[in-house]
Amino acid sequence: MNQTNLLTTIPLRYQFPVRLLHLFAIIALASVTVTNAQPRSSQKRLTPAEPRPVSAPKRVAKTKPLTAANQRAAEKRLADLGYWTGRVDGRWDEASRQALIAFQKVERLKPTGQLTRADFEKLIAANRPSPLETGEAHIEVDLVRQALFIVDGGGVVTNILPVSSGSGKEFKSQGWARDAVTHPGRYRVREKLSGWKKSPLGELYYPVYFMYGTAIHGHPSVPTRPASHGCVRIPMFAAKRFNRMIPVGMPVIVHDGNPPPPIPTITGH
C-alpha cells in the first residue's frame, strides 16, 4: 500500500496533521543527507601528540672531601718540594696557606690558597721546580709567576715564597711622578736591615736591598698579583729568617721568564 492510499483511509480531519508530520520528516532527512555529504577534507583529524622523551638526570660525581690526614700530607709534600711552610706540624695555618699559594703560582693554577681535591692530587704528583739558571747560589724573582726561588750552588731550588712585585701603576713620591715597576735585571744584595725600616712609601720589615731603594721585605699584605711600589713583598712569617739566611753580595736575578742580559763589564780608560 502506498502513502496516497494510506491517507485515503484516514478520516479527512486527521489528514492535515499527518501530511505536516510527513513534511517535517522529509526536511529532517534532507538536512542529515546534506551534512553527511560534506567533503571529508573539511573535517580536521586530531592526531595525539607523541610524548617527548625524558632524559635521565645526569649524575654528578661527588668530590671526596679532604681529611685531616690529607692536609698533613699536603703540608709535608709542600715542604719536601721546597715551599716555605714553616714548621711542619699538621696545622693548616697562614704559612701553610702561603706555601700553597706559591705552589699554585708556580704550577700556574688559580692562586686561591684553598686546598681542593684537584690541587691536592696535583701537589702529590708534582716535582720540585727547576731554576732559571744554575751555578753560583742566588735568588730568582719570577715576575710572571710572582714567586721567589732560593737556589743553592748545586742548582737546586731550596726555598720558594709567593711575592708581590711592582704594580706598574704611576704614583707620586716627594713631588715626583714614578712608575711602580720592578725592573728585570741582574743584581746583588747590597744591604740588610733588621726590624722595621721607615721609607717615604711606607715601612719595610727586615728589608734585603738589592738595588738602590728597592728591597725584598716582609709586608702584611702580599696579594696574588703585583701590587707594590717596586719592592718585592714576601709574607711576614718568612721575612726575618730570609733576611738572616741571605748574605750580602748574593746575586739576585729578576726576570720575566727569560734570562736577563749579563751585567756589562766597566773598564777604566
PLM-predicted stretches and their roles:
Residues 2-38:
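Sec-dependent N-terminal signal peptides
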Residues 37-67, 77, 262-269:
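Compositionally biased, proline/threonine/alanine/serine-rich low-complexity intrinsically disordered stretches
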Residues 38, 58, 132-134, 181-184, ...:
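Exported/periplasmic cell-wall-interacting domains
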Residues 62-71, 76-98, 102-122:
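Short acidic, glycine/serine/threonine-rich helix-capping segments at coil-helix boundaries
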Residues 64-71, 89-97, 112-113, 141-144, ...:
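Solvent-exposed, acidic/flexible segments
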Residues 71-75, 97-101, 120, 124, ...:
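Extracytoplasmic/secreted envelope proteins and their assembly/folding machinery
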Residues 78-88, 103-111, 127, 152, ...:
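Sec/Tat-exported extracytoplasmic proteins
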Residues 101-180:
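Cell wall/extracellular polymer interaction/catalysis modules
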